[in-house]
A protein has these predicted regions:
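Beta1/beta-strand and adjacent pyrophosphate-binding region of the FAD-binding site
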Residues: 1-12, 165-172
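Flexible, glycine-rich terminal cap/loop adjacent to redox cofactors
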Residues: 7-14, 18-35, 40, 47, ...
Length: 449
């Protein structure tokens, strides 16, 4: 029987980071993964999405902005096979890098599906393995609604397996995955329609920024269909898929993509044998230290439903290993002021509270809001002027910055530095005292009045 100090069930970003940090501190660590290392992010999420987003950015630049910069594009041809080949080569290099980090840190890789036998014992491929500490980092998978014909729809996982782009696609969902896929496919030349249940996309984001994005989607001729609740999917004889909605309308597309949320990967883990419990939403219940209800068993990342972002899982995992193996007994992940980017067209960057959240937290009378709206210089010299919208939210007499939100060209690369400032408790006066970099979009954040 193999024995370890710590094991991760799941070889995604969170599990890998946790075990590598534990190994750095001398722990006997192992990662159990039945599929490819890297999890959703590397294989079916952040990485392939971002590469395709870059491709869409290039297509947008050639089509919309190139002519006004003096570049003609009559002969430009897009070959998706080339993008796909280079995307997959990059992903392969990323996956291969894990073997090197495991070797440096003494982490063992075990291929197979794990299930609990008891609180300190798991079974993999018929073999029993024991560990003092077990981390559940199994991630999540796309949720597919229970409607007739749902199986004729696909998910984001399937999109990244396409060998060629379709002529048309219908995306169902209003979250960041739906918005990002819609933008990417639209700008790569696919007839893309986005269907949402209510009247807004990204409903948890600041309304000022979301309004701006929806205006840009309209200008870019990306159809957004509101108040559309799918009732049934049907496969037509020509291979296309027809969606029937509750309002008695319908739509036909080559592919239908479900982007309706994600569910935790807890099936077949035999959690009952270990005594691990789920919360009311079906995610593994943990406290602020990533502890489950069973001592020695932890969970982090998407399987907990807490801020489902790759860097959050990585940070939580490294912090856990610092607590367990480096004497930092009070170390825990701080889930406040986590910066987030939506790779839409244009991108959204945000950190801290929305206006609505700030009003609830501090009281409407105690907050102050600053906004700025302009056309980014990159697009302002062209016929396709793209708006940028920036917003600062401050609280209290000292005007502590509690929320920063941006929509516009380059926002995705701006937000990290401002997140540091907000994490440190910067005030509006601190922002005002900072000399602007001109001409940039980011200068708007330090010149608002």
């Amino acid at each position: 029987m193999k024995e370890f100090d710590i094991i991760s069930i799941g070889g995604g970003s969170g599990g890998i980071a946790t075990m590598n940090r534990a190994g750095e501190h001398g722990a006997r660590a192992a990662v159990i993964e039945e599929k490819q290392l890297g999890g959703t992010c590397v294989n079916r999420g952040c990485v392939p999405k971002k590469i395709m987003w870059y491709g869409a950015q290039i297509a947008e630049a050639i089509r919309d902005y190139g002519p006004d910069y003096g570049f003609t594009s009559e002969q430009t041809r897009f070959d998706f096979a080339t993008l796909r080949k280079n995307r997959e080569a990059y992903i392969d290099r990323s996956r291969n890098s894990y073997d090197g980090s495991f070797k440096r840190n003494g982490v063992e890789r075990i291929e197979g599906r794990a299930r609990f036998v008891d609180a300190h014992t798991i079974e993999v491929n018929g073999e029993t393995i024991k560990a003092k500490h077990i981390v559940i980092a199994t991630g999540a998978h796309p949720f597919i609604p229970s409607v007739p014909g749902a199986e004729f729809g696909e998910t984001s996982d399937d999109v990244f397996a396409w060998e060629e782009l379709p002529s048309s696609v219908a995306i169902i969902g209003a979250g960041y995955i739906a918005v990002e896929l819609a933008g990417v496919l639209h700008h790569l030349g696919v007839q893309t329609d986005l269907f949402i249940r209510k009247d807004r996309v990204l409903r948890s984001f600041d309304s000022y920024i979301v309004d701006g994005l929806m205006e840009e989607m309209k200008k870019q001729n990306l159809p957004l269909h509101k108040h559309k609740v799918p009732m049934k999917l049907e496969k037509l004889e020509d291979g296309r898929v027809k969606i029937y909605f509750e309002d008695m309308t319908s739509h036909v597309a080559d592919h239908v993509i479900w982007a309706t949320g994600r569910k935790p990967n807890v099936q077949d883990l035999n959690l009952e044998a270990a005594g691990v419990t789920l919360n009311e939403k079906g995610f593994i219940a943990v406290d602020e230290y990533q502890n489950t209800v069973i001592p020695g068993i932890y969970a982090l990342g998407d399987v907990t439903g807490e801020k489902e972002l790759t860097p959050v899982a990585i940070k939580a995992g490294r912090t856990l290993s610092e607590r367990l193996f480096n004497g930092k007994v009070n170390a825990k992940m701080d889930y406040t002021n986590i910066p987030t980017v939506v790779f839409s067209h244009p991108a959204i960057g945000t950190v801290g509270l929305t206006k609505e959240e700030a009003q609830q937290t501090y009281g409407k009378e105690n907050i102050k809001v600053y906004t700025s709206q302009f056309a980014s210089m990159y697009t302002a010299v062209t016929q396709h002027r793209q708006q940028a919208k920036f917003k600062l939210i401050t609280a209290g007499p000292e005007e502590k910055v509690v929320g920063l939100h941006g929509l516009g060209y380059g926002v995705d690369e701006m937000i990290q530095g401002f997140a540091v400032a907000i994490k440190m408790g910067a005030t509006k006066a601190d922002f005002d005292a900072t000399v602007a970099i001109h001409p940039t979009g980011s200068e708007e954040f330090v010149t608002m009045r």
